[in-house]
Amino acid sequence: MTNIRKKHPLFKIINDSFIDLPTPSNISSWWNFGSLLGICLVIQILTGLFLAMHYTSDTTTAFSSVTHICRDVNYGWLIRYMHANGASMFFICLFLHVGRGXYYGSYTFTETWNIGIVLLFAVMATAFMGYVLPWGQMSFWGATVITNLLSAIPYIGTTLVEWIWGGFSVDKATLTRFFAFHFILPFIITALVIVHLLFLHETGSNNPSGLNSDADKIPFHPYYTIKDILGILLLLMVLMILVLFFPDILGDPDNYTPANPLNTPAHIKPEWYFLFAYAILRSIPNKLGGVMALIMSILILALLPFLHTSKQRGLTFRPITQVLFWILVANLFILTWIGGXPVEHPFVMIGQLASISYFTIIIVLMPIAGMIEDNMLKIYP
C-alpha cells in the first residue's frame, strides 16, 4: 500500500499534498480555514448541482421553480437553504482566511496571495450572480444597480452594460447568462484552488511565529487531518444550526416578493458579505470614483507585499501594528453596518469616515507603524 501511495503517478500527488506533506508543527486553528473553504466549495457545488436539476432560468418561471424546489422536491428546502447559508459560511471562512493571511504576513508568498485575490473576486462574482437567480425583488434590483455601475466606465460604459444585459434592461437574457456563468464559475474556482495549493506547496506553509520552520516539520497526516476534521465538524454544526433553525436570518425579506420592474424596494442592498464594499461605493458621491473605490477595497490586498516595511513577518511581536489591525477589523464591521443602513444622516458621514479610515490604515498607518517598531527594536541591517 505504501508503495502504491508513493509511486503511483496520481496517488503520489495526493500523498504529497495531503498525507506526507511536511507541515510546521506550530500552526494554529487559524490555518484550518483553507480546508474549511475546500469543504464549503464541495458543499456549494453539490447542493448547486441538485438545485440546477429543478431550477428554470426563465423570468416567468424562475421564482416559481425555487418555490417548487422548497415545497415539492424531496428535501428541496434543505438543499436550497444549505446552498444559501453555505454561501454565507463560505464568506465567513474567506474573510477569516484573508484576515489570517494579513495578520501573519502570509502575503509574502506573492504567487499564492495573488491567486487568492483572483479567487476572492471569482467567489464574489459567483455569489452575486447566484443571488440574482431566485428572481425576487432584491435579486432583480440588486442586479440592476450593480451591473449599472459599469456604465460609469468612460466611453464604453453604456455599451458594455447593454452587452452584459443582453438588451436595454435586466431581463430574460440576463437571467439565462447569469445562470450559465453561476454554473461554470465554481469549476473555474476549483481549478484556481488547485493552482493556489500548487504555489503554496512550493514554499510550504507560514506559521504563527513568522520564522522559518524547516527544522521543525511534521507530516500532515494524521496530525492535521484530524485537526481539520474537528474544524469541518464545527463548520457543519454551525451551518446546520443556521439552516434548520434560522434559514432566513441572513437573507432579505424582499426576495420573497417576485421581481417587479415597476416597483423599487425602499432600500436596495446586497447580501451581508458585500455590505462593506457597498458602503465604500456609496460613500463617494461620484459614480466612477465610487466604482474605483469599490474595486480598490479588495484590490488593495495586492499592495500588501509592497506596503510591508517591518523586518518581522507577522504581527505576533508587533503591538502597534496589532492595534491598527484590530481597529481595521472594527472598521470593517462598521462599514458592514453602514452598507445595510439607509442613505441618510448620520450614516452617510459615518460611512465616509470609515471608508477613509479603511484606506488610511492600510496604505499609511500600518507601513509607518512597521518602521517605528523596527526602530524601537533597534533592528538595523
From Swiss-Prot:
UniProt-annotated binding residues for heme b b562: H83, H182
Gene responsible for this protein: MT-CYB
High-level lineage: Eukaryota, Metazoa, Chordata, Craniata, Vertebrata
Disulfide cysteine pairs (residue numbers): none
Main location: mitochondrion
CDD domains hit by this protein: cytochrome_b_C (cd00290), Cytochrome_b_N (cd00284)
Transmembrane intervals: 33-53, 77-98, 113-133, 178-198, 226-246, 288-308, 320-340, 347-367
SUPFAM superfamilies for the chain: a domain/subunit of cytochrome bc1 complex (Ubiquinol-cytochrome c reductase), Transmembrane di-heme cytochromes
A Pfam cross-reference name: Cytochrom_B_C
Name this protein carries in UniProt: Cytochrome b
Keywords: Electron transport, Heme, Iron, Membrane, Metal-binding, Mitochondrion, Mitochondrion inner membrane, Respiratory chain, Transmembrane, Transmembrane helix, Transport, Ubiquinone
GO terms assigned for molecular function: metal ion binding; ubiquinol-cytochrome-c reductase activity
Family membership noted in the UniProt record: Belongs to the cytochrome b family.
Binding, a ubiquinone: H201
List of residues binding heme b b566: H97, H196
The species this protein was found in: Peromyscus truei (Pinyon mouse)
Biological processes annotated in GO: mitochondrial electron transport, ubiquinol to cytochrome c
InterPro entries: Cyt_b/b6_C, Cyt_b/b6_C_sf, Cyt_b/b6_N, Cytb/b6-like_sf, Cytochrome_b, Cytochrome_b_C_euk/bac, Cytochrome_b_N_euk/bac, Di-haem_cyt_TM
CC cofactor note: Binds 2 heme b groups non-covalently.
GO cellular component: mitochondrial inner membrane; respiratory chain complex III
Membrane topology: Multi-pass membrane protein
